[in-house]
Amino acid sequence: MFQVQKELASHEAVVVALFEEEKTSSFVQELDKAFEGQLQVLLEEKELSTKKKAISKVHSLGKTDVKRYYFVGLGKKESYTTETLRSALGKTFKTLQAAKVQDAAILLDSFVTEKLDAIDVAHIAAEVQGLGTYELQTYKSDKKDRVELEKFTAITAEDAQEIEAALTVGYVHGRATNSARTLVNMPPNVLTATKLAEYAVELAEKYDMDYKVLEKEEMEELGMGALLAVNQGSVEPPKMIALIYKGKEEWTDVIGFVGKGITYDTGGYSLKPREGMVGMKGDMGGAAAVLGAMEIIGELRPEQNVIAVIPSTDNVVSGTAFKPDDVITSMSGKTIEVLNTDAEGRLALADGITYAKKLGANYLIDVATLTGGVIVALGNHTTGAMTNNEELFEQVLEASMETDESIWQLPIFDRDKERVRNSKFADLNNSPGREGHAVMAGTFLGEFAEDTPWVHLDIAGTSESSGAHDLGPAGATGAMVRTLATLVERFGEE
């Protein structure tokens, strides 16, 4: 699909950057000659806009070998960022998709500034080509034909091999994010814990990773009472899924991803209202993020050891379901008083974290659609983070800045720990109250990370979008897939 060339050839469409300071770049000047001065007229009359994310289409009318030019406004260079570029190109690729373009080129060097080099631009272009044109996988009987971009050429004077490598990495990041989106969008009667485990096994086998899928009996032997409690009411068997990627000869410096895999959450006996229940098929967004990251890792083969652990079940009501006031024993040996069966994700993750440590994780990053409280605190565009290790958090933060997936750190104070430890009957309680809900959930998980460096990522607000946006349609976003993979790719760098 991807090609790199030094000279512009015949294409259906060519994408060109327009900055406010460079309305008459060398390329535009040359092209204007072919258009007999008409481009300059369009610029002067503002028919070609330099405004951020403005897309101006110009037909060549046979004056060049290119059928149509798409000029992408990027505003002033001083305010040009990777986020601006991602949004602008995402919108552009959506426009090309709507026009059913199959052969497009991007004038890569027109997007290069002192802030962003050609490799950065190539990576982002290939990434958002996939993200921006992603479509929901539906179950409608009337299937519409989709015209795909078959040929995408980067025009640049830079080294072709380096640009090809950047295009490949960007493409893999975009495709894996879309894989995660598809998982989150699947209905709960299709994506059960068993089906999620089957998907994970297929992924592991494709990329020659080791894997384990623990069944209920094995979980009982290991004392995974927290996950098993959540599963008590279900007819669907639980799964504890583990993928093991060995990027080094020695099993050291192991990064452990733990993704919440609740395939549907009714709230249990702490039942959600109807409005709060619809959409809870997406409560396995953390699991999807982890699997998406493992897809990237499998493709790119970084020299880093990684474990991905996914505790998976649904949380439903029945005569056997767990109840408020139950006391359960987690794999760690710590006992938990259940005050809220709708705070089930942290119970599943507690055993997932302990199991990741058992498998050898030296660093822990858990990802979960955990609390509505994080949405109240940070909205729908920022992931909440908590940590017991600032050095590890800084690496996660840097990765998120590279991928434009914003995160914000929330605190853990001793008084927060006292609240989750406040129980007359057990070591911990699973829900101290509504105040500081997002912080309480993260603090609870920290009790199981203990001294292992750990970062908690609450993606309840960022896992799905209520409306279409420049990087995709309404629905699942694939939040944190690219950040987790970038963390692994950059881990330990100075």
UniProtKB/Swiss-Prot annotation:
Task: Spell out the NCBIfam families in the cross-references.
Answer: PRK00913.1-2, PRK00913.1-4, PRK00913.3-5
The organism is Bacillus cereus (strain ZK / E33L)
Q: Quote the record's binding site residues for Mn(2+) 1.
A: 265, 342, 344
Give the reactions, separated by semicolons, that this protein catalyses: Release of an N-terminal amino acid, Xaa-|-Yaa-, in which Xaa is preferably Leu, but may be other amino acids including Pro although not Arg or Lys, and Yaa may be Pro. Amino acid amides and methyl esters are also readily hydrolyzed, but rates on arylamides are exceedingly low; Release of an N-terminal amino acid, preferentially leucine, but not glutamic or aspartic acids
Cellular component annotations (GO), alphabetically ordered:
cytoplasm
User: What keywords tag this UniProt record?
Assistant: Aminopeptidase, Cytoplasm, Hydrolase, Manganese, Metal-binding, Protease
Q: Report the GO molecular function annotations.
A: manganese ion binding; metalloaminopeptidase activity
Name this polypeptide is given: Probable cytosol aminopeptidase
In UniProt terms, what function does this protein have? Presumably involved in the processing and regular turnover of intracellular proteins. Catalyzes the removal of unsubstituted N-terminal amino acids from various peptides.
- Presence of the UniProt keyword Metal-binding in the record: yes
Catalytic activity, EC = 3.4.11.1, 3.4.11.10
According to the record, cofactor stoichiometry and binding are noted as: Binds 2 manganese ions per subunit.
Please, which domain of life does this record's source organism belong to?
Answer: Bacteria
Could you say which cofactors this protein requires?
Answer: Mn(2+)
Encoding gene per record? pepA
Kindly give the SUPFAM superfamilies that the UniProt entry links to this protein: Macro domain-like, Zn-dependent exopeptidases
* Entry similarity comment: Belongs to the peptidase M17 family.
